[in-house]
């Protein structure tokens, strides 16, 4: 029953927040980013109230400050995509192109400047992917978030990292903030 209550309240809240922020698609990007932060806090609230989930952040003092960096995080659930927005200011997500096709949600992802890639496919479009990353890094101090294993995984899975995160680190020379997330248990 707790899982059902969580699902009802969580998804209803996400829909309400998404609808409330629809006009923000025509306003400055920072308003949509604020909506993402609210979704992160809503996610945390629902997890705590309905599922008694305690969110523990270890090593917060090690978060990179005052310079450009990217975040390489493990990806086990929807939780981290929302929650990371409460920790980092206006992150730019590197994500699979299919997410941009989701009505409303995809519009928000485009508005905040998310960088998309067609996974497992070499194409002309993907050749510009790295140029988009360079442009984003040069335009702002917003951190990039990449899930280097390329998809959500069960806590026990350990597939190899994709090449994107190492290429960003090696070729652009910006710092990497690794984050291990245990949201799948």
Annotated model-derived regions:
Residues 54-185:
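Soluble catalytic domains of membrane acyltransferases
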Residues 1-56, 107-111:
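A transmembrane-helix-recognition feature enriched in membrane-embedded lipid enzymes
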């Amino acid at each position: 029953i707790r899982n059902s209550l969580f699902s009802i309240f969580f998804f209803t809240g996400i829909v309400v927040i998404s609808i409330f922020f629809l006009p923000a698609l025509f306003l400055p990007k920072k308003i949509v980013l604020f909506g993402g932060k609210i979704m992160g806090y809503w996610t945390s609230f629902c997890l705590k109230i309905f599922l008694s989930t305690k969110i523990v952040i270890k090593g917060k003092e090690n978060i990179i400050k005052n310079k450009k960096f990217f975040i390489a995080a493990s990806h086990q659930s929807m939780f981290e995509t929302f929650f990371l927005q409460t920790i980092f200011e206006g992150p730019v997500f590197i994500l699979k192109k299919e997410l941009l096709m989701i009505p409303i949600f995809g519009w928000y992802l485009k508005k905040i400047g998310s960088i998309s890639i067609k996974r497992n496919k070499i194409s002309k479009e993907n050749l510009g992917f790295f140029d988009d990353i360079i442009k984003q890094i040069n335009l702002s101090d917003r951190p990039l978030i990449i899930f280097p294993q390329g998809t959500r995984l069960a806590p026990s899975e350990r597939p190899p990292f994709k090449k994107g995160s190492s290429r960003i680190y090696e070729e652009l020379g910006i710092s990497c903030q690794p984050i291990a997330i245990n949201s799948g248990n």
